[in-house]
Design a protein with these regions (language model features):
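Segments that shape or occlude catalytic/ligand-binding pockets
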Residues: 95
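Bacterial N-terminal signal peptides
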Residues: 10-19
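Short, well-ordered surface patches within globular domains
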Residues: 98
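Bacterial N-terminal signal peptides that target proteins for export
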Residues: 2-10
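Extracytoplasmic cell-surface/polysaccharide-interacting catalytic and binding patches
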Residues: 21-90, 102-186, 194-219
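Short, low-complexity interaction segments enriched in Ser/Thr/Pro/Gly
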Residues: 3-4, 19-21
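Conserved metal-phosphate-binding beta-hairpin within the catalytic cores
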Residues: 191
Length: 219
């Protein structure tokens, strides 16, 4: 599960990303699993396991991100494989139309980004993912909460979990941080590439600057 195989996957991922960038500069997103098939994908908004309790994505929707984000995810996956764990992606690129539906269903200004304010959700720019851990058999492991949890258990610094859950969360956060992601204090599963602002148009970058840091980001 580790050693030379991880290096091969990392090389393939980087090569795939470079080809994607060079092949079509006008199409900024790549399929995470086309870059690294070992990363598990379970898009929660393609099913009912989300806070609106019904699908928002059509069946067959792929997990898309910026090519640079896909390369960083492969780095995180390589780190986790050394410890017999791996990534599962719950969400990646999210169309503004879906973000609008989430906002209309919630109107929770503390947790859900209004797509018409500032930069909206960073998912809509392909620079953020929602991720959790799986074991070496791609089975889910214990984490502080499920996806789209608005209770204190979703907080990154929540202290009510067991030692095993804390260990899993620390491992996920460490691997993602090492790969170049920032976490979100209100959603342990949400990660944004640290240099996300450079992928936004100038006007959006100005809005992001006025909006604040990544710690104030929302779903």
């Amino acid at each position: 599960m580790h050693g030379p195989h991880n290096k091969i996957w990392l090389f393939i991922a980087l090569a795939t990303v470079l080809m994607a960038i060079n092949a079509n500069a006008d199409c900024p997103f790549v399929d995470i699993q086309s870059v690294n098939p070992t990363i598990v994908v379970e898009l929660r908004y393609a099913g009912t396991k989300n806070f609106v309790n019904h699908p928002l994505y059509p069946q067959g929707t792929r997990a898309l991100v910026r090519p640079e984000v896909a390369a960083a995810l492969t780095k995180a996956q390589t780190t986790l494989r050394r410890y017999q764990y791996g990534l599962k992606i719950w969400d990646a690129y999210r169309p503004v139309s879906v973000q609008t539906k989430l906002w209309e269903a919630s109107r929770n200004i503390d947790h859900v980004a209004n797509p018409e304010v500032g930069v909206g959700s960073l998912h809509s720019w392909g620079v953020a993912v929602d991720a959790t851990l799986v074991d070496s058999w791609n089975r889910p492991v214990s984490m502080p909460s499920d996806f789209d949890d608005f209770t204190p258990a979703a907080m990154w610094r929540y202290t009510g979990s067991s030692f095993e859950v804390h260990r899993h969360l620390r491992l996920l956060h460490w691997a993602m941080d090492r790969a170049g992601f920032w976490g979100m204090r209100t959603e342990w599963w949400h990660y944004t590439i640290s240099d996300w602002k450079k992928f936004l148009p100038e006007e959006a970058r100005q809005s992001a600057h006025l909006q604040g840091t990544h710690w104030k980001g929302k779903l």
